[in-house]
Amino acid sequence: MLNEILNILKADSELYSLLGANVKDSHIYMNNGKADTCISYKYSSITSDGIKVQSKLEINCISPDYAKAESIFNRVKQLLITVGNRQLNNDILNVALNGGGSLYIEETKQHIIKAYFILTIRERMI
């Protein structure tokens, strides 16, 4: 499921532009950011009942410019959050924002907007 989420983020031209991404570098990284303006993420499973899995996606929108970090965060929300009965795709049934916050790292002069998304995913136990 993580690959499907990453594909949605990487395929969006508006997010691509905000991140200053290029063909060789999407500026979307696992665990730690590697560019001044980027997204870093962590992914983990929370619960499973054999029918549905809940997973947590932690997203960090990072930029020296707070307004840009906020724009990146808002675009990620637009791309991922499911409204009403809308599913993200056939397997990802629901995506909801479940907390977050912002901080400023003095040493690197970077603003970080952190968001926790909860994904409800169809599970196929065989």
What residue spans do the PLM features occupy?
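Short, charged interaction patches at domain edges and termini
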Residues: 1-8, 44-54, 94-126
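Small/polar-rich, solvent-exposed N-terminal microdomains that initiate assembly or binding
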Residues: 1-47, 87-88
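Short amphipathic alpha-helices in soluble, non-transmembrane regions
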Residues: 9, 72-78
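Secondary-structure transition/hinge residues
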Residues: 13, 17, 84, 121-125
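Extracytoplasmic
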Residues: 36, 54-56
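Short hydrophobic/aromatic beta-strand micro-patches
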Residues: 60-62, 120
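Catalytic phosphate/metal-binding cores of nucleic-acid and nucleotide-processing enzymes, i.e., regions
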Residues: 67
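A common structural junction motif
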Residues: 77-86
